Amino acid sequence: MQLRFEEVDKHFGQLEVIKGFNGEFAQGELVALVGPSGCGKSTLLHLVAGLENPTAGRVLADGEKIPGPSPRRTLVFQEHALYPWLSLQANVAMALELQGVDKASAFEQSKVWLERVSLDGFEHYYPHQVSGGMRQRTALARAFIAKPEVLLLDEPFGALDALTRMALQDVLRELIAEHQPTVLLVTHDVDEALYLADHILVFSARPARVLKTFNMTHCEKSHDLSEFAAERREILRLLGIKTEVGH
C-alpha cells in the first residue's frame, strides 16, 4: 500500500503538532521517523491508522483518503497491549476472529504464527507469565497474522534490553521481507533506525518538520553499523546530540 501525505497540518486545540508535512512512501518500504519526544511522530502514525484526522491537508492510502481504522493498517505500540485474561495463542487468534474468521481456524493459524516468532510451546501461557520480549513477539505475531498492508510501529522495542531488542529487530526484518507491508517506524534509537530502515526522516521539535531524509538502501546491513558512522553522526547532530569530545 502506498502512503502519501499532502501538506498535512495537525492541531490539538491551540497546540500545533505537525505543520505542512509532505511525504510519499512506496509499497514495501520501511521508513523510520526519528526526532525529539513530543514532536508529532506518533501523531503521524495515528493519522495513517485512521485514529485521528488531519486539521488540514490529506493523508492518502493507495490514492484514497483514509476514512477510519482498518485491519489493513495495523498499529503496534511499545506496550504490547495484549489482553491479560487471554493466552498468547488466544491473543494472536483474536486478530483473525475480529475479521470474522471462525475460532478453530484462527487458533490453528495463531499456533503457526507463534512458531514463526519462536514461541512454540508457549501457546497456553498468559502474558504475565512470560518475559517482555516474549510478549512483544506475541504482539508481532498478532500484527502479521492479519496480513496488514501497512504496519505502524510506535517504539515497539523501546522497553526491552539491548540483546532482546536486537533479536526482535531480526525477527521483524524477516517478517517484513516475506510479507512486504509498508512500514512506518517511530524510534528514538538511531542505531535501530539505521539497521531497519530503507529511509530515515529526521524531524525537528514541534511542530514537526523534516530536517533531512537519509536513503539507507545502498548496501546490505548487519548489526555492525560501522559503515554508517557518518550517517549516525549527522543524525545525532541534527537532533542536537554532541558526539565528539571537546578539547
Residue spans for each PLM region:
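Helix-to-loop junction immediately C-terminal to a conserved catalytic motif
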Residues: 49
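Catalytic Walker B motif of ABC-type/P-loop ATPase nucleotide-binding domains
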Residues: 151-154
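Conserved signature/switch motifs of ABC ATPase nucleotide-binding domains
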Residues: 125-128, 146
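Hydrophobic anchor residue at the start of the ABC signature
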Residues: 76, 140
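Conserved ABC transporter NBD signature motif
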Residues: 57-69
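The feature captures the beta-strand-to-loop junction immediately N-terminal to the Walker
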Residues: 34-36
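Short helical segment in ABC ATPase nucleotide-binding domains corresponding to the A-loop/adjacent helical element
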Residues: 89-97, 107, 111, 215
